[in-house]
């Protein structure tokens, strides 16, 4: 399969650079996987597509203010984007500077704080901060908005680039399908008889990396840490027993569940995943999906195509562009039911 098969033209004006005033004010494009039919709705209409007995699985990762500005002790300016917190003081980070820091380099953080560069791991730098890193980031860090938002973060992003159910700090990008849910909608979902469960996948900056190969089979996925607990395994089993559907909120929830069921059976799992889901790969757990609109030629668009079918997905995206839907992290959403016989671009 060619990466170019997943290209579509997206007008710049459709990239959402700010959130709407209300979380649930977004639009919702519903795609019925088995038939390919589309329905244009509001996000609050998601309730109409859920059934009593369904199970919704959310990713409860919490975005950390992972971007730091500062300078080397010698004077050169730099920017740090934390990729992964290793322990109370150490992180792996991307560092942008005119000259890459060498081991032993001391970094002075804008707003207070310092770190030492310990060693390099390919594209990432291992840094040790003089004080506990999570409180430091909360104090002086900036929210790591995606590159396509193309503006400095502001105070509103601290709240809006975060789900209302975020619990476990560690992500450097939001699980954006969850941004549409407010407390009132979550209460209405539970009141309808829909169960909820939470996985954790700490979304890394690699989620924004372009696919740099021509054939998608040659692409190597970035690694992210996830945890699927026994409580989630039990909730999925109970859902299956009562005839309900497993509805994943976001591609990160899909990747978590399918990583924990790689041999076909869902089991508790804690560790790194590099799962790459593209057309032809089976789904063992997820029956329906809530997701935002993704970048052209991205691995997330490939995942959606694997779930809904390639022609159905690309037709839905063409309709979304024509109808002026807002794209990417702060944009609109889709509700998709799984296509039982999905076709790829070469079928």
From Swiss-Prot:
Gene Ontology biological process terms in this record: queuosine biosynthetic process; tRNA wobble guanine modification
Record keyword Transferase present: yes
Origin: domain of life: Bacteria
Single Gene Ontology MF annotation: S-adenosylmethionine:tRNA ribosyltransferase-isomerase activity
Swiss-Prot/TrEMBL catalytic activity: 7-aminomethyl-7-carbaguanosine(34) in tRNA + S-adenosyl-L-methionine = epoxyqueuosine(34) in tRNA + adenine + L-methionine + 2 H(+)
This protein's pathway: tRNA modification; tRNA-queuosine biosynthesis
Compartments where found: Cytoplasm
GO CC annotation, single: cytoplasm
Main location: cytoplasm
Keywords: Cytoplasm, Queuosine biosynthesis, S-adenosyl-L-methionine, Transferase
EC assignment: 2.4.99.17
Assigned protein family: Belongs to the QueA family.
Known role: Transfers and isomerizes the ribose moiety from AdoMet to the 7-aminomethyl group of 7-deazaguanine (preQ1-tRNA) to give epoxyqueuosine (oQ-tRNA).
UniProt subunit comment: Monomer.
Protein name, per record: S-adenosylmethionine:tRNA ribosyltransferase-isomerase
Natural source organism: Pseudomonas paraeruginosa (strain DSM 24068 / PA7) (Pseudomonas aeruginosa (strain PA7))
